[in-house]
């Protein structure tokens, strides 16, 4: 816009766009120094690359098919997809902060997210740290 970059509210809560260009940094240097960098949708650090999730009500790429119980488990235990066997949530998701919320508070957040406009957006999968990859 005329005042510089503006948020696109049509994409609110839909996570990191799959077609977004990657941040141009030396991942090896970032990881070896324990540094992190972000554009607020993609985070690069010692854990690799993590992307913001689609938490809209979209039933295929968001949380539209989740139950309140899955949502609560995700934020209480830090498990992706709200499944006990799911992978751990990655930085920068501050799930321990949400873990202290009551069931009623988490259900209220979930109810709000269920009411959002469904936005179909396939978020990229997280990437392992380059220092952990076999050469």
Regions from the language model: what does each represent?
Residues 73-81:
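Glycine-rich, acidic and aromatic/proline-enriched surface loops and short helix-turn segments
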């Amino acid at each position: 816009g005329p005042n510089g970059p503006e948020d696109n509210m049509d994409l609110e809560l839909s996570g990191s766009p799959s077609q977004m260009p990657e941040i141009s940094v030396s991942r090896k240097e970032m990881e070896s120094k324990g540094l992190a960098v972000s554009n607020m949708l993609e985070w690069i650090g010692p854990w690799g690359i993590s992307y913001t999730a689609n938490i809209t009500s979209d039933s295929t790429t968001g949380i539209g098919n989740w139950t309140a119980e899955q949502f609560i488990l995700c934020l209480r235990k830090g498990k992706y997809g709200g499944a006990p066997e799911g992978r751990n949530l990655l930085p920068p998701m501050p799930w321990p902060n949400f873990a202290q919320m009551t069931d009623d508070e988490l259900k209220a957040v979930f109810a709000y997210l269920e009411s959002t406009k469904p936005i179909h957006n396939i978020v990229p999968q997280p990437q392992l740290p380059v220092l952990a990859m076999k050469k």
